[in-house]
């Protein structure tokens, strides 16, 4: 059902809504999200931004990162990670393909993760190869390659990305996700996501691991996450990766006491995240 609704929304964005100027499209999209969650909607002041989402939308309208297309590409960004913080932070890559039919299931390990390189929310997590519906998976990946994330959110960094499917090593089930919100190269807040695919809980901390003065519509965990022993290392990694940018969110994981790079996000949730 979720995929079906995504297809409908993509068609709406690609055709009738494509006629709207960016400012109106952004406000329509933001208010649809607000209404869907029963949250008070408001008109975004993009020209004179004061709130976080307004500033994210300003950055969408005013690209100021010369290599943003490179950073947003989940395949090409690996070279930046290798050169900036070292190859040890990369999740092992199993394969990369331009065409879905070139992917041979028999040659993949029993557990793996398939992703599109040119957007967000396009993942297939396989924990047992014998249980995967491969035809369904291939149809989903064909849809990914056929369509552009730019149509959904008008994020400029996705507009001309060469589309590929990548396969990475599966780390573990329900791995904790640490997302570092970096302003002018400095990590200020940390979003922690737990049990994303079962009972998703989210909490926010400062860089000192103190509770942040805001949250989102996601419920917070009953027991707040403990400060990870690798926090200082992760803060250092986030600082190095975000040092040249007005804003970037650096996503990291911890697996078997090792820090791994997830992705660099320039416009979290397309500027439509709801903070309370």
PLM regions: where:
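Membrane-proximal basic amphipathic "stem/tether" segments
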Residues: 1-63
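A conserved helix-loop-beta module that forms one wall/lid of the active-site cleft
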Residues: 45-131, 141-156, 164
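Short, flexible loop/turn elements at secondary-structure junctions
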Residues: 97, 118, 169-171, 182-184, ...
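Phosphate-binding site of ATP-dependent enzymes
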Residues: 108, 130, 134-218
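Protein kinase-like catalytic core scaffold
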Residues: 112, 188, 248, 260-262
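A short, polar/proline- and glycine-enriched secondary-structure boundary/capping micro-motif
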Residues: 125-126, 199-205, 271-275
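A long amphipathic alpha-helix within ATP-dependent nucleotide-binding catalytic cores
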Residues: 160, 164, 202-259
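C-terminal active-site "lid" helix and adjoining low-complexity regulatory extension at the edge
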Residues: 236, 254-276
């Amino acid at each position: 059902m979720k995929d079906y609704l995504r297809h409908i929304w993509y068609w709406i964005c690609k055709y009738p809504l494509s006629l709207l100027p960016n400012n109106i499209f952004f406000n329509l999209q933001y208010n649809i999200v607000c209404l869907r969650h029963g949250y008070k909607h408001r008109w975004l002041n993009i020209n004179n931004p004061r709130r976080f989402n307004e500033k994210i939308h300003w950055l969408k309208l005013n690209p100021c990162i010369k290599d943003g297309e490179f950073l947003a590409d989940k395949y090409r960004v690996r070279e930046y990670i290798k050169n900036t913080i070292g190859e040890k932070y990369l999740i092992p890559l199993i394969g990369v393909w331009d065409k879905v039919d070139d992917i041979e299931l028999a040659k993949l390990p029993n557990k793996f993760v398939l992703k599109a390189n040119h957007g967000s929310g396009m993942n297939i997590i396989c924990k047992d190869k014998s249980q995967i519906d491969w035809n369904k998976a291939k149809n989903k990946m064909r849809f990914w390659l056929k369509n552009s994330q730019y149509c959904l959110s008008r994020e400029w960094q996705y507009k001309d990305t060469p589309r590929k499917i990548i396969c990475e090593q599966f780390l573990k089930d329900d791995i904790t996700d640490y997302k570092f919100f970096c302003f002018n190269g400095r990590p200020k807040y940390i979003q922690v996501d737990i049990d994303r695919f079962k009972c998703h809980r989210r909490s926010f901390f400062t860089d000192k691991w103190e509770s942040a003065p805001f949250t989102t519509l996601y419920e917070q965990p009953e027991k707040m996450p403990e400060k990870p022993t690798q926090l200082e290392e992760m803060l250092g990694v986030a600082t190095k990766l975000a040092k040249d940018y007005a804003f970037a969110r650096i996503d990291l994981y911890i697996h078997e006491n090792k820090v791994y790079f997830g992705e660099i996000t320039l416009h979290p949730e397309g500027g439509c995240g709801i903070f309370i």
